[in-house]
């Protein structure tokens, strides 16, 4: 710093304040604005070490410690504090003989609110000691006997420069506060910079811009790194963790393209035959719409059903059925005879199949108003006549006293289920079995009991559980009929093996 320029400003400062005391007209000084401009120019000299800006007071250290330690301290508050201390110094070197300036009360309002709330106690004591004040009893500062007027003037001039420096730092802060800088940052920059106020503000702006650019670059690098890591994880992770929907659709498509299994019921164009010799199971079959159109009544028309083919050279009973263009598979759930339930026979859309030599198919269509109250006298099922087709074919003598042989059902050519796809033994065994069934001797008309199934005389068997009587033909035909009491099958025994004699029923017995 130019020492000559500073000494010249110090001399003008002293003359300005001494001129206030001179009462001679025309010699009183006006405003100190030119002094402020000169002081700002002095503090903004280029390439000047900050340590040479202040000689007595360590200005930047005092301001920095105050801003760090006191929450009520700020650059504007420090400006007021330095201005008040400057006034004390001016009064002391202008009026040293006045007693009111020989002591300073620390508990007064202006001192408490403007000085003690802004500066630290040690800094206040150091500044007042330069002016010649010593602390007394902790509540006041008392002036020493000998007062060096030159030193007091120099302290006053330093306080004046401190006030101007606070104004400059306030101006710098107003320019860079939008960049996130605080007053303490401005003080730190001003303390270490050899530039003027404009140079300090430009340096702070450049630093803020470089920091923002660095932050943006680091964020961009972090994003690129995270993206590359994610790409690496996606590359090395297993490709398939679970089957996708497309795979499921592909599998389901080929599942649907598989040929039907042997256990599924299908109306194909290969010849089908029935084995008469094997003990097959009864099946419950739900017909397709194409089959429902073939018969509109429980008995059906023989012309609507496929005919029985002649016996081939191997002695097999062959039956061929060519389905319609739909070729719809009939999926059934066959049940053994032991688990047959009577309520299944009462359903309106059920086909009952007895796999015997002459297979009998009985279909119950939904009852109409005319046939709703008509039931079979033998089995109790709803039908259009007094006897259903099954009971009519099993017991022809009871339903047709005229003696005409019962006509075979036209449904004999229908075969269902996987068991019916197997090849059968010769027809001769079936014919022998039929001859055996129909050649049984008729019961004597002198019997005292009537059959509980066909209501014919000659019941020679009795159930040991429900006491129901049955003839020999019905015993073979209805041996799977469930017992009414214990939901089990009937246990028929010949009457001659019972220890009691069955009584004669005077009325027809229904199922």
Swiss-Prot record:
Tissue occurrence: Expressed in the testis and to a lesser extent in the brain, while skeletal muscle and kidney show weak expression.
Keyword presence, Nucleus: yes
Signal sequence coordinates: none
Location of the PUB domain: 77-149
UniProt cross-references to Pfam families, sorted A to Z: SPATA2_PUB-like
CC annotations in GO: cytoplasm; fibrillar center; nucleoplasm
Functional description taken from the UniProt entry: Bridging factor that mediates the recruitment of CYLD to the LUBAC complex, thereby regulating TNF-alpha-induced necroptosis. Acts as a direct binding intermediate that bridges RNF31/HOIP, the catalytic subunit of the LUBAC complex, and the deubiquitinase (CYLD), thereby recruiting CYLD to the TNF-R1 signaling complex (TNF-RSC). Required to activate the 'Met-1'- (linear) and 'Lys-63'-linked deubiquitinase activities of CYLD. Controls the kinase activity of RIPK1 and TNF-alpha-induced necroptosis by promoting 'Met-1'-linked deubiquitination of RIPK1 by CYLD.
Similarity field: Belongs to the SPATA2 family.
Assembly mode: Interacts (via the PIM motif) with RNF31/HOIP (via the PUB domain); the interaction is direct. Interacts (via the PUB domain) with CYLD; the interaction is direct.
Protein's recorded name: Spermatogenesis-associated protein 2
